[in-house]
């Protein structure tokens, strides 16, 4: 079986060269495992000239860019090609069909104006001035217009052998539309041009793409065609076409459903799907399989009054008719397509036969999913826009073109955003929603007037796709880094519907400077690249092994000797004197009940003692101590022991420490890498302090991995940071690890915890699980920690920097569960001891009163 696959980004099929495909990394869509896939520039090429294509394909691939001298053939901005388009009309016959070897023919260089957009002469563009926009920065479109104007003087050159597809009838007389189509197909990224050259805000340096279309060429043995990043698949059975013939299948999904299908008795629950076929001489039907965004209610009345239907039309706007050959199981529908046509439009809708009180709309009979997609730029910048997209089905494309972006109060050309994350939730009925976004990182903020957006009930009833924009900006001149922000969806009464967190991509990488810039431009480059703020200088205090000075003590009123030892709990005899680290108390479960405990030290061991079992006395009242010496080193060694058993995300740890530690040498010395010198960073070209810190951390990780039976990465790193007095950073790392480990330990029990913490409804819980469901429609047991982590991360974000309350409330909620995991997993109790000991450790171990709060 042979399936020839291709991707294009406009239904008109604009020609694409191999070099153009290197501008943006594209992921191939998923196909059946049995498919044999080969790339093809145009299906007609294989259909009409299979031998020629095979013969010359290998030779062409030997050249890095075989079209280097002829790429102007697909460039609609050169006047000679524009003139060729107007003068040589060939009744929609592609030149490729007349001369399929045209792509592989070597030609002379001729004039440089026949070059690719990759070869734009930047200096020539810089010398060009626009009378309309002198002194102002130029957009990519304007730069390309300059090239177009320059080419006008050379319209007599290369007046033959130009490659231009004439099957774009609808674009012939609309140059702007053709330009947009060409940019879309070619995936021209603004970031491909030097940002300092075009002086544009880097926040808008995004690839220009249109909706993704998936097309495959399938032979008589059949196969499957799946729309990328979706649950939409067309299955082509064996024998669908005769032996020797091929079927071309093209899929395209539109987020906006037909508005006439959304009213009180009907609502769409899938995107509008366009299926294009190249061969109608068929012998077998096609099978469409897709997931839908709703299920009929389980009650008998809903089952009788409501049905899910697949609607078919030959036009995008209808009229639609119901297809009878449908099968629905839970949230998946299968449709047998018998009456085939060259272009078909299909959409799934829930329809009610009638409404009976108290039902007001079709929504009362179904459980409808509403999805939110978070879109943003490929890289973040000091100021960037996040687009929140809301729709009534579960399809969210990987890239989305937004045409109503405004900058400085003016509309700019369409911008393509990348999908950062998505979330689905269930709504009982269409109603107004309030969506707010807030940053979880103090280095970034959301513009005040854009923190909260409203979605109207009418928009949900009409099935509209709603786009809301949120502007993020870097606070002052702080260092750029990825960060997390939270999205909250609420009802008008303030009841939360969905809460989730999104992690941004990395900041934009530094673009390579042009090596051949003139001297005056190089000087300007140096000025522009000057740092925004001076290097942060922090003098870290030295950790001192000093004896702890306790001010509070407790005399035990009874003996406690446990048959089954419990980690982090003290055992004592009646009359023992225990040194207390303070008057603060922690609430944790003991043998069977939740009690209040002091953190104390007895016989050289730190642990918990029940408050009711001791009588607190002052230092002057102490008559006898079993051990009078307990140093800061003893304290540090014991309080960090639970970190050996905590789970962590290495990338998060690496990012946080690299950003918040400002002296790599101090960190290296504390970790035992005092032999490292500046010369060690030359081979990795680490210039920034954060890069050097990152190198030290990676070295620690490698060493701990080599001796993983005796060394623990997180444990050793936290010990080093505490010796540097980086307590705020330590608290952040501990909270991250505790939340993640709790999620892993909880597994499917997270639902019970969510109900106890914030009283989540069943629908809200399902909203956390939907993104992690597998092919069976359920979350696998081994993957259940993911929705648990999503929930706990969102919940903990509301505490801000108050790490003690987060850990205490988490411990209390876990203890209240029917079968508490904390009865046998005590590491969270150990973490509570740690955070309640930090203040005593700091006061005693560091002679300076200066706080290094990072």
Swiss-Prot record:
Main location: cytoplasm
Pfam families: DEATH_SH3BP4, SH3BP4_C, UPA_SH3BP4
Residue ranges of domain ZU5 in the record: 212-349
Domain SH3, chain residue ranges per copy: 549-619
Signal peptide: none
Keywords: Activator, Cytoplasm, Nucleus, Phosphoprotein, SH3 domain, Transcription, Transcription regulation
Keyword presence, Cytoplasm: yes
Top-rank taxon, per record: Eukaryota
Record-linked InterPro entries: DEATH_SH3BP4, SH3_domain, SH3BP4_C, UPA_SH3BP4, ZU5_dom
Location of Phosphoserine modifications: 19
GO terms for cellular component: cytoplasm; nucleus
Subcellular location per the Swiss-Prot or TrEMBL entry: Cytoplasm; Nucleus
This protein's record includes keyword Ribosomal protein: no
Oligomeric form and interacting partners: Interacts with FASLG.
Function: Acts as a transcription activator for MET and as a key regulator of HGF-MET signaling.
Protein's name in the database: Metastasis-associated in colon cancer protein 1
